[in-house]
Amino acid sequence: MSDKIQELVDKTFTLSKDYKHHYVTIEHLLAIILDTDEVIDILAEMQIDPKDCSRDVYDHLEKEVDAYTDDEIQPKKTVMLERVFHRAFTQALFNGRQNLDTRDLLISILSEDTTPAQYIMLSLIHISEPTRQLA
């Protein structure tokens, strides 16, 4: 894993711990990668405002994820988070790269069905109506 990705993973675990969450989820990871230039560029191509996405992800983390009270508990990664990383690494290998990048992680997060992360991202896509030709 590259130093950049390891730093993002560390920040993801720190975010979960700061929120006193039992688990480190893909929503924590999404919150962290939303600050990267690469993901911001991808979101712009998808016509998603990164600030709106970040706001919605942090709202989800604050309001929908239960917190614990014991400061000694270390958050544990979920199976879904592991799957996201495995899928992202496979994506990188298929593209001839040995290391992940944030693009691989974002694609993998979007591939997880029925998750808050996917719902938030898809709900922010601005789909313009097709233009109709007048006969």
Regions from the PLM with identified roles:
Residues 1-128, 132:
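Histone-fold recognition with a strong bias for associated Lys/Arg-rich disordered tails
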